[in-house]
UniProtKB/Swiss-Prot annotation:
Gene Ontology BP term (one): D-xylose metabolic process
SUPFAM superfamilies named in the record: Actin-like ATPase domain (SSF53067), Winged helix' DNA-binding domain (SSF46785)
Stated name of the protein: Xylose repressor
Family in the record: Belongs to the ROK (NagC/XylR) family.
Gene: xylR
A GO MF term: DNA binding
Lineage of the species this protein comes from: Bacteria, Bacillati, Bacillota, Bacillota incertae sedis, Caldicellulosiruptorales
Keywords from the named record: Carbohydrate metabolism, DNA-binding, Repressor, Transcription, Transcription regulation, Xylose metabolism
InterPro entries for this protein: ATPase_NBD, ROK, ROK_cs, WH-like_DNA-bd_sf, WH_DNA-bd_sf
Biological source species: Caldicellulosiruptor bescii (strain ATCC BAA-1888 / DSM 6725 / KCTC 15123 / Z-1320)
Amino acid sequence: MGNHTLLKQINKLLVLKTILDNKIISRTKISKLVDLNKATVSNLTDELIKEGYVVEKGYGKSKGGRRPVLLQVNKDVGSIIGIDLGVDYIHIILSNFVGEVIFEEYANMKIGEDKEKLLRLLFDLIEKSVKKAPQTPKGILGIGIGVPGIIEKESGTVLLAPNLKWQNVPLRSIVQQKFNLPVYIDNEANAGALGEKWFGEWGKVSDLIYLSVGIGLGAGIIIDNKLFRGAAGFAGEVGHTTINFQDDVCSCGNIGCLENFASERALLSVIKKLVKQGVEDRYISWENVDEITPSRIIQAAKEGSRVCRMAILEVAEKMGIGVANLVNIFNPEMVIIGNKASFFGELFLEKLREVINQRSFIAQFYNLKIEVSKLKDRAVVLGCIAMVISDMLSFPEYA
């Protein structure tokens, strides 16, 4: 793709995103917002209308002269499937073209599930979604999948996903051959960051870090409204930064990784450590410690469990140290805590904010915002919807 064609595709996506963000808008207003001349905006919107992605929707008010024609994204042009392929779950949604959910399912699975069994579950969920898809002009536009690991985006290959025990899995090819639909693969934290930018409350924030906290830990980094990928496309693996030189071996094979101290798995590990040390209460004991779940820990903490409160505070402190390092390096306007940690509660968030502000060298000099994702555990799946739209329009062979 030549530079001129690439620039045109980027501008086209920018125009579409602007229409999506504003719900209904005139060409003149788009031109002002995206800093493109009126003729360019007119040509790009005409293409989007011709392709069916945008529709004209009546007239706006005029201060004199002709009333402007208003534009709106055609939400019913096609459906999109978004998938968060977690370590112990698969979360799938079918949405229309503006991210409104048509069908949603969440399936649990055991950690370290056999790859073939996992793929069968994935196929079953995709087939369910396909059957639920309404009749639209373009049908199902594509499938976006977020995976916790190192992804070669161009080929859609999972190079390494330690918590899934996957290596060199050509996931895009596998799913594409099965369903004969365009498939787009990315790291799930990157997808979460895209979800926040496209569909979240803080979409207009130009520099942010989305922290995806589940069994593992990853970061999607947005700099100047663009996803920061690094030289090879692998940026954001904050869970595998070293904060301890004498810890147990991580799933990646290294020692002292942050996700060993700051994740769902870490929360469960701290609970067991505290009980072993003799710190018990009426909620947690040796008899039930192996059955405790993260959601039960959060609930018990709210009800006054000493063990659960201590565990949440310890994990928040370790995570705060890791995030403070990211803040020092990237100087974001906002840090968004997402995925499973979006349910960790106020006790966790207050401690996290306290530690980040104490530990970050630069946080004291500006108004850093640290918030829990309002999209909760939907940020990744919605980011996968955004991934399909943006990749589809940036690479015309999938349009």
